């Protein structure tokens, strides 16, 4: 485990300067503070504060998902996490993020400088900058409907997309439908890719023809349907499977 002195030696600065950078002191430059934080993360440093039992701060980073109203998809996900955290005496901060935010702030550095012990990431896309950084993160992290290989610090939870889509195809097949369209969600999403694969597999398993005109990526919003349903109907679809509830 790296020490403050190790960081100081790496950067060629004093121990007190490193301490100021780690603790957010105002009498060093933003550039030097960022350099200290980035180096601390690179060297695997953990502050004493983050190792203390009483420091129990978690972050929920959320992107591409509404969560503030009870009717929105992310509401119960965020609420459930916060309720369970509260029962175990954890403080939770919900932080909406954007692609620009991820480019401006390195994940581990942001966690370290804000004293977070772990995080729950919801709604992220496969090509997001932080998803790349999570391959090497040392911070305890849980992903919702996403997956990072070969990093024991990153776990995930999610739905069984294969079983769900297969059940939908099977239900429509038993009702006599043969031309089943699939309006998927956003491209570059792990769940979209899995649901697309599940659709293809289930159609083949039921002996149904796959028509590429009946399979499209849209977006996880209600307006997505109006752009594609007319095309589906024109191609002879008698049933449509949607990638999520909003569509």
Which residue ranges define each predicted feature?
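Short beta->alpha connector loops
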Residues: 65, 98-102, 122-127, 246
């Amino acid at each position: 485990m790296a020490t403050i002195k190790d960081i100081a030696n790496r950067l060629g600065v004093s121990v007190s300067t490193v301490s100021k950078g780690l603790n957010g002191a105002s009498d060093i430059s933003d550039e030097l503070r960022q350099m200290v934080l980035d180096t601390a993360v690179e060297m695997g440093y953990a502050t004493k504060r983050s190792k203390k039992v009483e420091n129990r701060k978690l972050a929920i980073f959320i992107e591409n998902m509404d969560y503030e109203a009870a009717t929105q998809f992310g509401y119960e996900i965020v609420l459930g996490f916060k309720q369970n955290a509260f029962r175990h005496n954890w403080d939770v901060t919900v932080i909406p993020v954007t692609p620009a935010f991820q480019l401006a702030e390195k994940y581990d550095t942001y966690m370290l400088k804000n004293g977070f012990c772990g995080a729950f990431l919801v709604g992220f896309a496969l090509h997001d900058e932080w998803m790349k950084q999570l391959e090497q993160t040392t911070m305890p992290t849980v992903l919702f409907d996403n997956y990072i290989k070969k990093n024991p610090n990153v776990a995930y939870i999610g739905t069984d997309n294969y079983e769900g889509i297969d059940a939908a195809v099977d239900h429509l097949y038993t009702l006599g439908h043969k031309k089943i369209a699939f309006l998927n969600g956003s491209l570059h999403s792990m769940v979209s890719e899995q649901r697309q694969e599940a659709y293809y597999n289930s159609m083949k398993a039921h002996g149904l023809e796959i028509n590429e005109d009946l399979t499209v990526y849209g977006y996880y919003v209600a307006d997505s349907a109006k752009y594609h349903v007319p095309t589906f109907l024109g191609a002879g679809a008698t049933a449509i499977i949607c990638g999520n509830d909003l569509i």
